[in-house]
Each structure stands twice: as structure tokens, then as C-alpha cells.
């Protein structure tokens, strides 16, 4: 092991087992953290169907599986990654759904990972080849000309427009990029949001199907509690 070989300091490893929770759980025997594919599968279904009331139950139900193999497991939560269709494509390029996905990722229990380009709303499907889900970042509004020449025929060229660049989104208070930044700051500001246990809400949960678009939970840590509420539907609640 790292420490047995003389390694010093903290060492953090994340494993990838691309399957449902019951198949992935045994791998916690050898690794402290695993990418959480079940998290994205459940969240994607909830967003595609506008139904949030089952989300917390779905997430909490898998935790005992992991605990069977490792008491200090770390869920490396994520949306899509480099081997899957992009989040933007899975959510129909809906800006609102992508914003909810980002907000849920950064307010749920786990150690979240953000796949590059996700914070800009990139889309792409594996059926067109790996390049379509691995588009490089367009940093400034003027950079699309160079990128267009090197990436032509490998990605959806509509992504290389000035409006989707980091520069443009950084200047737009309502952009997806700035939403990611806002929730990242909140997570870094409040330890309960970063490290707290996820607890089901007593009212807005899987038993309340009359308000099924709502997903709500508490994050709890050292006597502190924070309420998290998300609306997965189209109508205001």
C-alpha cells in the first residue's frame, strides 16, 4: 500500500465501476471512494420526468449496501462523465434542467465531481464517437475560430459559439457557469453542506405524491441542520 511503501500524508483514490449500486458496492472493500453512477441514473430519471419526491429515498436506499463493505465509504457523486452521453444531451439541452442538476449535485451528500464542460452546458452523445463527449473548453469569445479548425467534424460545432464560452458565461449572472460557482461557494462556506448527512424531509418525500415535483432533504452535521429544497417540475411551487 501507499503508506506501507513509505508514503506520507493523505492519499485519496477514486474507483470507477460503471454499473448500478448493488454491483459497485463490493468494490468499496478495496477503495475509499467510487464514482456514483446510481446517483446520476436516479437524478436523470427525476429530471426527465419532473418527479423529485422519490429522489432522496432512491439515494438513501443504496447507502446500506455500501456500508456493508466499508463504514467510511465516500460517494463520489457525478452527473455524466467521459464515457457517457453528456448531461446536456440527456436533459434535452434544457438550461433549467441542467441548472437543477447542478444544484442537486452540489447540495446532496457525497464528494461531487464536475466533468469538464458540464458547467458550460456542453452536449454530445457517444454514438458519434468519443470526441462528441470530450469537447475541450472554449475559454474566450474569440477562441472559436482556432477550435473550429481543429475540431471540425468531431463535435457539434454549435458548441463553439461565443455565447457558450467561459468568458461570456462569466459575465452573465444567470449563466449555468455562475450557478455552479455560486453553489460551490456555498458548499465551501458551510461545512454542513459539504460534509453533513443527508436526511429525508418529513413532509416532502416519497410518500407525498400530491407534490411530487418537490425533492427536499436536510443536511446535518454536529448539531447543525440545513434545509435543501429543489423543484424538478415546470410549475412554481
Q: What are the functions of these language-model segments?
A:
Residues 1-21:
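Active-site neighborhood of glycoside hydrolase catalytic domains
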Residues 17, 38, 79, 141:
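Residues at the C-termini of beta-strands that transition into short coil/loop
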Residues 1, 44-53, 83-93:
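The substrate-binding groove and active-site-proximal loops of carbohydrate-active enzymes
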Amino acid at each position: 500500500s501507499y503508506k506501507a511503501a513509505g508514503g506520507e500524508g493523505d492519499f485519496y483514490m477514486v474507483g470507477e465501476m460503471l454499473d448500478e449500486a448493488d454491483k459497485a458496492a463490493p468494490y468499496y472493500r478495496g477503495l475509499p471512494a467510487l464514482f456514483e453512477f446510481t446517483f446520476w441514473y436516479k437524478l436523470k430519471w427525476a429530471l426527465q420526468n419532473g418527479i423529485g419526491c422519490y429522489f432522496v429515498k432512491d439515494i438513501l436506499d443504496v447507502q446500506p449496501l455500501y456500508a456493508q463493505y466499508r463504514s467510511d465509504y465516500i460517494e463520489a457523486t457525478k452527473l455524466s462523465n467521459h464515457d457517457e452521453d453528456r448531461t446536456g444531451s440527456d436533459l434535452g439541452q434544457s438550461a433549467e434542467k441542467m441548472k437543477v442538476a447542478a444544484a442537486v449535485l452540489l447540495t446532496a451528500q457525497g464528494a461531487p465531481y464536475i466533468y469538464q464542460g458540464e458547467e458550460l452546458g456542453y452536449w454530445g452523445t457517444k454514438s458519434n464517437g468519443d470526441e462528441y463527449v470530450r469537447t475541450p473548453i472554449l475559454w474566450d469569445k474569440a477562441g472559436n475560430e482556432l477550435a473550429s479548425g481543429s475540431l471540425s467534424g468531431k463535435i457539434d460545432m454549435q458548441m463553439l459559439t461565443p455565447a457558450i464560452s467561459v468568458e461570456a458565461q462569466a459575465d452573465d449572472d444567470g449563466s449555468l457557469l455562475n450557478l455552479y460557482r455560486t453553489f460551490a461557494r456555498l458548499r465551501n462556506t458551510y461545512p454542513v453542506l459539504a460534509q453533513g448527512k443527508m436526511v429525508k424531509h418529513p413532509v416532502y418525500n416519497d410518500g407525498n405524491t400530491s407534490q411530487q415535483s418537490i425533492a427536499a432533504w436536510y443536511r446535518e452535521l454536529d448539531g447543525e441542520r440545513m434545509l435543501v429544497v429543489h423543484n424538478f417540475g415546470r410549475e412554481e411551487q
